[in-house]
Amino acid sequence: MYRTRPTQLRAFFALKPLYFALSSLLAHNTYAQEPTKIDLAPVAVTGNPLGVGSDELVVPVTVLNGRELSLRRASTLGETLNGIPGVTATQFGPNASRPVIRGLDAERVKIMQNGVGILDVSSLSFDHAVGIDPLIIEQIDVVRGPAALLYGGSAVGGVVNAIDHRIPTEKVGGILGRAEARFGGAENQRNGAAVVDVGNGQFAIHADAYKRKTDYLDIPGFAVSRRKSNADGTPRESRGKLVNSSSEGDGGAIGASLTFDNGYIGTSYSTLNNNYGTVAEESVRIDMKSDRWDVATEFKDLGPVINRVKFRMAHTDYIHKELESGVVGTTFKNRGLEGSFEAGHTPISTSIGNISGVAGLQFNNTTFSALGAEAFVPSVNTQSKALYVYEELPIDAHKITFGARLGHTSVDSSSDAKFGAGQNNGFNTKNLALGGLYSINNNWSLTSNLSHNERAPSYFELYANGAHIATGQFEVGNSRFSKERSNGIDAQIRWKEGKDSFSIGTYYTRFSNFIATFNTINTRGLDGELNPIDADGDGVADGSGKGILPEAQFLAVPAVFKGLEAEGKFNIADNLNLNLRGDYVHATNMRTGDYLPRISPLRLGAGLQYQIGSFNARLDALHAFKQNRTADNELVTDAYTDVSALVAYKLPVKLNIELFAKANNLLNQEIREHASFLKDISTAGERSLLIGVRADF
């Protein structure tokens, strides 16, 4: 049962005036001076230190904002992005879903909030939710492929940056805001959010608040797949409902900044509370809380040598408690500080063009602890610092990009009665990148990017030694790991004419020592006993009476990831647009030739969008093919076709108010994502209808 803490009540009442103010504005909009609404331009903030247009970037970047983001918004960050070319999701039930980019997840996909890491523990375990709620996000940038040069080794697979504008970066004159409410869907969601920015042209204040609640997810059949039941005899008991999948959460923020003609300086405080069922176990819930303080400043047009400086920093206090039948079993804490300072220089003239670029310093200091019976990692302090340089050289209509990064990471564990003496590990890393954009003509262009990437192993890859209940394994790390190395190439051909566009790209990444968990032939008792005797086969050790789990070790193996991505947008008739997309990933262990686990199959998608006046309608279909290229102890995942439809209508009133309805899984298919660890005991929701209203002012 969800229990409201006193701190949550204080946060709610502190933000309550925002709801009344917003309601008043919606009902009596003539009281306020009508402001000028500024729409966000579809320009990537992430992986774009020089602020060029998205079409000029060498690396593939997807930008979601405005209406497009609003229509894609889901309960989790992973599901909001799932279906973008190259992006799937871990989908650990409806409440915990992290983005997977090109088959890579966890410590190889960096998730940021306003350019700074979120510092939660979602990369440690699939049942840990990302500490960002999509209801408040204003823009999401997705960088597909290595971005370690700018963001460190944890971005070797890509970057997801959620931008919420809680620190206003531009001048605000008057009152701007939005509100949104959603009801229904397969989980019977009741969600609402409100955002307000108030300013006098120099000083701006931001406030936002949201609340969400869901019930058990309605599913189109049994939670347990037929393949799993046939393979190991797991009974197919739960039908029509995904047990222990409800959730309840709330949060909000307040921020302020001084804005100038050439920059800003500001700060914000935000809080997030989330209580949800883990699905994997019927009696386990996670009660999460995250408090975050941000400061940010940026100034441009400064002088003849250094023309721009930017500083961002965030401090996060994160805690979540795993409740077993209402009793706290294990408590996870992560407290940390992360930030960056970046300076841009004025263009340097050369015989072939003017070189523009930036130099930066990044730093991170986090302390993680897990206290309780199910802790499988000791307390760890991780510190990192890095220097990087990124440069661009335009040559006529073409461009060359290059850069380097040098860093050091220390990962030090504490002494513990359960895990033994503390250990210290340090890693020196370097990352290099060389890219180019060749403009064939006004419509066609080619891009390519070469990179060498190095990543320090994470604390759980080094020091894990215990039962990981969420994965059903006893995980064993290796403190002797060296840094993970990879080399990659990414190439794309792009076409654009007016609003029509098409791109197709390919990539190849080779890891010399890819770190991942692999099943061994051993078993472990929950107390760590190796190969305990279980004469009667009941899954309980005869001597200790403890449960038994298969052992999984973190190993470093040579591996290759390669794939294709394609996307097109075309106007095929008056007011009618066609969208096409597809992706494919192939990943293997080069030592054995085996396929790597949880790799998404070939996916092809298409969508139609019709808009005339205030009316908008969409029909979308995504087909995921059968995935039979499986790793050891991994079951085949059946194909599915996910069809959805949406209609929206803007009311003829002064405020920009839009009503919308979205139907999901119209074919009522059993949708199981191969990238999900829970794919055989949890399925996506059944055919459902979601309705909502949103307003901008």
Which role does the model predict for each range below?
Residues 117-144:
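Short acidic/polar hinge/loop motifs at secondary-structure boundaries
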Residues 41-70, 98, 106:
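N-terminal periplasmic "start-of-domain" segments of outer-membrane beta-barrel proteins
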Residues 173, 177-180, 184-187, 191-288:
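Periplasmic-side early beta-strands and strand-to-turn transitions of outer-membrane beta-barrels
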Residues 357, 396, 507-511, 532-630, ...:
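Gram-negative outer-membrane beta-barrel transporters
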Residues 220, 454, 510-512, 517, ...:
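C-terminal beta-signal and adjacent terminal beta-strands/loops
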Residues 244-245, 336-342, 386, 478-482, ...:
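Outer membrane beta-barrel strand-and-loop segments of large Gram-negative receptors
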